[in-house]
From Swiss-Prot:
Segments crossing the lipid bilayer: none
GO cellular component: cytoplasm
CDD domains cross-referenced by the UniProt entry: UreE (cd00571)
GO molecular function: nickel cation binding; unfolded protein binding
GO biological process: protein folding; protein-containing complex assembly; urea metabolic process
Organism ancestry: Bacteria, Pseudomonadati, Pseudomonadota, Betaproteobacteria, Burkholderiales
Protein role: Involved in urease metallocenter assembly. Binds nickel. Probably functions as a nickel donor during metallocenter assembly.
Subcellular location: Cytoplasm
Organism: Burkholderia cenocepacia (strain HI2424)
Family: Belongs to the UreE family.
Keyword set, alphabetical order: Chaperone, Cytoplasm, Nickel, Nickel insertion
Pfam families, sorted: UreE_C, UreE_N
Sequence segments annotated as region (Disordered): 171-202
Protein name: Urease accessory protein UreE
Record flagged with keyword Cytoplasm: yes
Length: 202
């Protein structure tokens, strides 16, 4: 089994013909966050990916196998939320609230894209945005916190729901104090940050 253990720096320009001839490894965002994984090229060949911890692969990246061959990375279509708004301010507000919980977000011309999550979808709709579930490649911003991903309905589900309640003032007339201090037994590279932090919401 061949091992893909080097990524060619994005600023290194390769001959287009070399890249065009390279086999493709198509991966969803979650897999592109992993520095070590067993994968299958689009040709059907099984390979091992062994990259420095914290590496987050992007569509178009080129890896080098231990035999010197090149492999091109492609972002696989996956289930995502496509968020649009009637005005830029509403979309900016949505981006702010997503960034506030370190949710990985792809920012495009007039849209936001994020991993499908029913709680976040509800929050975004209440903020006044149009949210549609679709199937498309997902390439979030690296940003100050690195990439980042979340795990469906585990410990972060409660945090998502608490955030949704807080954002929309569902506790008007009440004095709530939420103290969250979660210890997650997850290990991710710096490019895939959950946002492991305590919240103190008043």
């Amino acid at each position: 089994m061949r091992t893909l253990d080097k990524r060619i720096a994005p600023n290194v320009k390769l001959a287009a013909s070399l890249v065009a001839r390279a086999p493709t490894l198509t991966l969803a965002y979650d897999a592109r966050c992993k520095s070590r994984l067993a994968a299958t090229l689009d040709t059907g060949e099984d390979v091992a990916v062994l990259l420095p911890r914290g590496t987050v692969l992007r569509d178009g990246d080129v890896l080098v196998a231990d035999d010197g061959a090149l492999v091109r990375i492609a972002a696989a279509p996956e289930t995502v939320l496509l968020v649009r708004a009637a005005d830029p301010l509403t979309l900016m507000r949505a981006a702010y609230h997503l960034g506030n919980r370190h949710t990985p977000v792809e920012i495009g011309d007039g849209y936001l894209k994020l991993e499908a999550d029913p709680v976040l979808a509800d929050m975004l709709r209440r903020l006044g945005t149009q949210v549609d579930e679709t199937h498309a490649p997902f390439q979030p911003e690296a940003g100050a916190y690195g990439g980042g991903h979340k795990h469906g309905h585990d410990a972060t589900f409660a945090e998502d729901y608490a955030l949704a309640q807080q954002v929309f003032g569902e506790h008007h007339g009440h004095a709530h104090s939420h103290d969250h201090d979660h210890d997650h037994d997850h290990q991710h590279g710096p490019g895939c940050t959950h946002g492991h932090h305590g919240h103190d919401h008043h």
